[in-house]
Amino acid sequence: MSLPHSIRLAAGSGPTFGVDDLACAAATHLGCWEDEGLAVTWTPALGGIAAMKKVLAGEVDAAYGGLGPVLQLRAAGEKLRIVASMARALAQNLVVQPHIADTGQLRDSSWAVDGIGALSHHMARCIVSSLGLDEERIDWRVVGPPPERIARLLAGEVDASLIRVEEALALTNDPANDLKMLLGFAELKQLVAVQPHGVLVTTEAFERINPEVLSKLARGIITASRRLRDDFDGFVQTYEYYVSVSLPAADIERIWAQECASEGFAINGELTPDHWQRQIASFAALNPHLPSVTREAVIADQFVREALADLGRRAGPDRGPAG
């Protein structure tokens, strides 16, 4: 069936999706965007910075990636705009080599990240800052999305890396290696209360010319987030189709329950002023050398507001107002 509207999206997660970006997968797999009359084609990108560069180069119309690259590029003068959040936090765990016994031993360690400024690097910097460690003593190794980071861990080439929750479970439960989980989901949530997360991003030019397409994009991602939150079967269906890591059913249900309990699903599109002022303040504290970015400049909240006016606001921390 030919749909009346189409959009090209870059995926900063590369060729795979995980729990931390499952809303994008669900919007495609569960037909949420199709129900809006929107045909979506995905282009893999090796990290959020690469995804945003594809948007700026005109190779795609919009992208999914971490909020850090968006703020970084916006500070540099690039006219990027956030259309909606696809999560409210980062569903990853910190996996380390066996010689790392505690967080103090992360000092002088090597970390595998997807890119400088990208999501795993942004969150890693938040962790290092919260632990009171000197970031200058961390050896950041740019290797790419989770599969590449896992490969470096298994090869013993790096000391630590943030890995998707499902991949971390499978990895640390595998007797074939001696990697361990130093900080799990709940511990990271306590350590870093304001966590960077994924967003859908476009350019000011595309926003100006294609408002109807972006309205459909926002409605679809909100609907997908709600279906993941409300329907465990839909979560499992999307997980099993897109996520390459096989886990026992009990572990998948535990991950879903964890996401629900932590209110990680962006069931109202999470563009609320308080959330974003805290995100921008956290980013500015990590990057004091960059020009300041305002919420009004970087966020196109009209599409989420329109979607919520039609779909209704759900109870939750991102209930609003969104603008």
Residue ranges and their predicted role:
Residues 2-136, 140-143, 155-165, 178-185:
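Short, glycine-/small- and polar/acidic-enriched structural segments
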Residues 14, 85, 190-191, 271-272:
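Short Gly/Pro-enriched turn/cap motifs at secondary-structure boundaries
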Residues 25, 71-74, 125, 169, ...:
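Predominant activation on well-ordered alpha-helical scaffold segments within soluble catalytic domains
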Residues 48, 103, 146-147, 232, ...:
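Residues at or immediately preceding the N-termini of alpha-helices
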Residues 148, 158-244:
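Pocket-lining segment of extracytoplasmic ligand-binding domains
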Residues 150-153:
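Rossmann-fold dinucleotide-binding core
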Residues 209-290:
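Secondary-structure end/capping motifs
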Residues 280-323:
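Conserved C-terminal helix/tail region of periplasmic/extracytoplasmic solute-binding proteins
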